[in-house]
Amino acid sequence: MIVLKWLFFTISPCDAAEPWQLGFQDAATPIMQGIIDLHHDIFFFLILILVFVLWILVRALWHFHYKKNAIPQRIVHGTTIEILWTIFPSIILMFIAIPSFALLYSMDEVVVDPAITIKAIGHQWYWTYEYSDYNSSDEQSLTFDSYMIPEEDLELGQLRLLEVDNRVVVPAKTHLRIIVTSADVLHSWAVPSLGVKCDAVPGRLNQISILVQREGVYYGQCSEICGTNHAFMPIVVEAVSRKDYGSWVSNQLIPQTGEA
């Protein structure tokens, strides 16, 4: 078992932040892929705007230097240029905004009939997960707490401050619904590779839909300052095949059924 765990941690693909990383993590959901594509498209326009503004600035500094123009020109009003610098930025903003609308609405889209519903409950300073679709008894669902693994207990291949004792296991290529809430203060359930960041508010249920397109391990953290140990609330989502997911659920339900 130890050998298998070591092989899993060293061979399985992991999506987590890397030192000196400037770009996005690899996308694992359609939403995250859309965010990356939108970023690249907008960045192209931003480069054009930057070059244009720098050209105007350098040209003004070069041609209107005080040594070349000892007596400055006094221009107090220019209707044409005022119209131009109002219309053109508006058009540019429209070209930037319109492509983002489809992505924005798709992020709020709720799957009518998800295959699995998982409830994530934030605590100071750990997460509780409930798989309400699988009942081990008439009153109890598949529930477990997820704590960060201390640095001294990490195994080979595990990531510092990002590993947990119980991962959120989900099937890949399956529509999921995540219901996020909090038991005490504000938290935020965020996993960058999945394109997910949902606030956990006490007394409120926030809902997000996820479709993980590939198997792997995805790391996130609480993204809302929630107290002293805010930085020690990692989130680990493990996407597996449907067959492996079914085996995991069965193994999780057996001990809970025995306790009941």
Curated annotation (Swiss-Prot):
Its cofactor is Cu cation. Residues 1-41, 108-260 are mitochondrial intermembrane. Residues 63-86 are mitochondrial matrix. It is an enzyme of class 7 (translocase). Mg(2+) binds at residue 224. Keywords: Copper, Electron transport, Magnesium, Membrane, Metal-binding, Mitochondrion, Mitochondrion inner membrane, Respiratory chain, Translocase, Transmembrane, Transmembrane helix, Transport. It is a multi-pass membrane protein. Cu cation A1 binds at residues 187, 222, 226, 233. Gene3D superfamilies: 1.10.287.90, Cupredoxins - blue copper proteins (2.60.40.420). GO terms for biological process: ATP synthesis coupled electron transport. It comes from the Eukaryota. Binds a dinuclear copper A center per subunit. The keyword Membrane applies. GO terms for cellular component: mitochondrial inner membrane. It is found in: Mitochondrion inner membrane. The chain crosses the membrane at residues 42-62, 87-107. Component of the cytochrome c oxidase (complex IV, CIV), a multisubunit enzyme composed of a catalytic core of 3 subunits and several supernumerary subunits. The complex exists as a monomer or a dimer and forms supercomplexes (SCs) in the inner mitochondrial membrane with ubiquinol-cytochrome c oxidoreductase (cytochrome b-c1 complex, complex III, CIII). Component of the cytochrome c oxidase, the last enzyme in the mitochondrial electron transport chain which drives oxidative phosphorylation. The respiratory chain contains 3 multisubunit complexes succinate dehydrogenase (complex II, CII), ubiquinol-cytochrome c oxidoreductase (cytochrome b-c1 complex, complex III, CIII) and cytochrome c oxidase (complex IV, CIV), that cooperate to transfer electrons derived from NADH and succinate to molecular oxygen, creating an electrochemical gradient over the inner membrane that drives transmembrane transport and the ATP synthase. Belongs to the cytochrome c oxidase subunit 2 family. This is Cytochrome c oxidase subunit 2. It comes from Arabidopsis thaliana (Mouse-ear cress).
